[in-house]
Amino acid sequence: MTRFVDQMPDTDECLFIMAGSGNISGASLQVLKFLTRKFKVNLLYIKPDHELLGRTAYLQDKICYRILQEYARSGAVSSMCLVSNSKVEEILESSLTAANYYDKINELIGYTYHMVNVFNRTKPVLDNKIENSSETRIYTIGMVDFESGEENNFFPIDNETNRCYYYAVNENLLEEDYKVLRNVNKQVKEKMKDLQGASYQIHPTKYETSFAFVEVWTSNIQTYPEE
């Protein structure tokens, strides 16, 4: 394992993707032990529908789900993004078939995670982003309707600490229409009524259609669904 990690590209960060119910999920802690020696590790945890799991897969998922959150909260890994297959299925329900089920779900997860990652590494034209506390390392991502502000989050986070909204707006619209900023401010103010903290970033794009994403953060360990 050491030889394998040594041959990986010399980048500062590493994304570790896993599903807790997989046959090799039990090896995740050992793999992470080697990865964290070289990289700042971000963890993307795909949570299966626990009601459909067999006994062994159920126990594997429950153990990994808890222990890896403890890893994140302690700082052993930089962050842990929780994604529920069931929640993503609800978002895509009208476009899913038996043949494309997993491809469509994985496509949406990958696209959303990628876009949020891009915006986190790109200078916005306007923002008031709130920095997380050192123990706030567990989160989920989601999609936001740009016009209405309706959210579709990929995991139901309990006891959230804050949210950050990422608005991607056509660059010409940003230059010509002040209503864009007014709409964003209105949405964020509405969210802040029920939250400890909410912030936003606005990014220019060349896409004709404007769209938005959200990160929902917490410093608390998320319980297993039936607990």
Protein language model features and the residues they cover:
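Tubulin/FtsZ superfamily GTPase core signature
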Residues: 1-227
